[in-house]
Amino acid sequence: MNDAINHTACETLFTQARTHNGWLDKPVSDAQLQAIWDLMKMGPTSANCSPARIVFVRSAEGKEKLGPTLSSGNLQKTMQAPVTAIVAWDRAFYDRLPTLFPHGDARSWFTSSPQLAEETAFRNSSLQAAYLIFACRALGLDTGPMSGFDREKVDAAFFADNGWKSNLLVNIGYGDPGKLYGRLPRLSFDEACLLA
């Protein structure tokens, strides 16, 4: 049985963490990006399928490719962010299953059903995007996840050679608290949950 994390850790991960739109001029290192991956990869996925693939965009060239794919409301904050993670999914994720899930022939579950493969990859890469956000928060970084972009343009710009498919974007860095909006409300337990 696991011990509950303390209140401060819960604040860091959930109740005091915010989605940032403005960023301080402070870099994110290669070592930090590696640490993010090393945490997020440990989160559970269906049959350990681990379909997420990440492109950490931070160079001027990378930002130049990403810019035209963004909705107008996401352009400035993304260009300012030290890093933007493109969370994508690998259409051929199942080719890694003999290593990742050696308990049976899991690869055949997906090669025999392209629809199941796509649904599994998209669902589990979305789950892994959440792990990325919480890994960033655990490591003292802030995030700004976004879905306002043209997926086809991102795929053409970044994934023409490997067939990956973009899911969502996450800006990463040190957020500027002066550019935060007031915290928006959340649904109560009674509004969002049922007991069965």
From Swiss-Prot:
InterPro entries, alphabetized: Nitroreductase (IPR029479), Nitroreductase-like (IPR000415), Nitroreductase_HadB/RutE (IPR050461), RutE-like (IPR023936)
GO molecular function: 3-hydroxypropionate dehydrogenase (NADP+) activity
Keywords in alphabetical order: Flavoprotein, FMN, NAD, NADP, Oxidoreductase
A Pfam cross-reference name: Nitroreductase
Cofactor: FMN
Catalytic activity: 3-hydroxypropanoate + NADP(+) = 3-oxopropanoate + NADPH + H(+)
Disulfide cross-links: none
Stored CDD domains: RutE-like
Coiled coil: none
Keyword field contains NAD: yes
Top-level enzyme category: oxidoreductase
Entry's EC annotation: 1.1.1.298
An example Gene Ontology biological process: uracil catabolic process
Family named by the database record: Belongs to the nitroreductase family. HadB/RutE subfamily.
HAMAP family listed in its UniProt record: Oxidoreductase_RutE_HadB
Entry function: May reduce toxic product malonic semialdehyde to 3-hydroxypropionic acid, which is excreted.
The name this protein goes by in its record: Probable malonic semialdehyde reductase RutE
